[in-house]
UniProtKB/Swiss-Prot annotation:
Crystallins are the dominant structural components of the vertebrate eye lens. Residues 1-34, 35-77, 83-123, 124-166 form the Beta/gamma crystallin 'Greek key' domain. This is Gamma-crystallin 2. GO terms for molecular function: structural constituent of eye lens. There are at least four genes coding for non-identical gamma crystallins in this multigene family. Monomer. The keyword Repeat applies. Residues 78-82 are annotated as: Connecting peptide. It comes from the Eukaryota.
């Protein structure tokens, strides 16, 4: 919806969309009827990322948005089964490494470091957060190697918390 509280012009989306600009000029509220989604601030799945699961978001601040700009979106495929990821202190999957299987509200408490410079997502989908307790900028990771922070769309290596995307979407 273009306006808060589900008012104004709206667009219903059922799959990935690389450019939403032709449907609306701003996005201030969203209803997610099913599944999990990543919203992107810019077209072609670029810019700030926002994770949404089923529910109502009457205001962009409810999804931790920095503005009313939503220009593309992707459905996160449901993935059942275990989650496993290796996080690294340095780029190119080097330096201190820690294998993780669970959500982490404080990377510093777990890893004794504020930065993750690379990671290898072995199983499941994950969300990195720039601040502790799942706050701040968000980055969606699917299975694969991320040899530097720019590979997951970040401008720096600051990752202060992360969580698994579970089947409950």
């Amino acid at each position: 919806y273009e306006d808060r509280n589900f008012q104004g012009r709206c667009y219903e989306c059922s799959g990935d969309c690389a450019d939403l600009h032709s449907y609306f000029s701003r996005c201030n509220s969203i209803k997610v009827d099913s599944g999990c989604w990543m919203l992107y601030e810019r077209p072609n799945f670029l810019g700030h990322q926002y994770f949404l699961k089923k529910g109502e978001y009457p205001d962009y601040q409810q999804w931790m948005g920095f503005s009313d700009s939503v220009r593309s979106c992707k459905v996160i495929p449901q993935q059942k089964g275990p989650h496993k990821m290796k996080i690294y202190e340095k780029e190119e999957l080097k330096g201190q490494m820690l294998e993780v299987l669970e959500d982490c509200p404080s990377v510093f408490e777990l890893f004794k470091n504020h930065d993750i410079n690379s990671c290898n997502v072995l199983e499941g989908h994950w969300i990195f957060y720039e601040q502790p307790n799942y706050r701040g900028r968000q980055y969606f990771l699917k299975p694969g190697e991320y040899k530097r922070f720019s590979d997951w769309g970040s401008l720096n290596a600051r990752v202060s918390s992360f969580r698994r995307v579970l089947d409950s979407c």
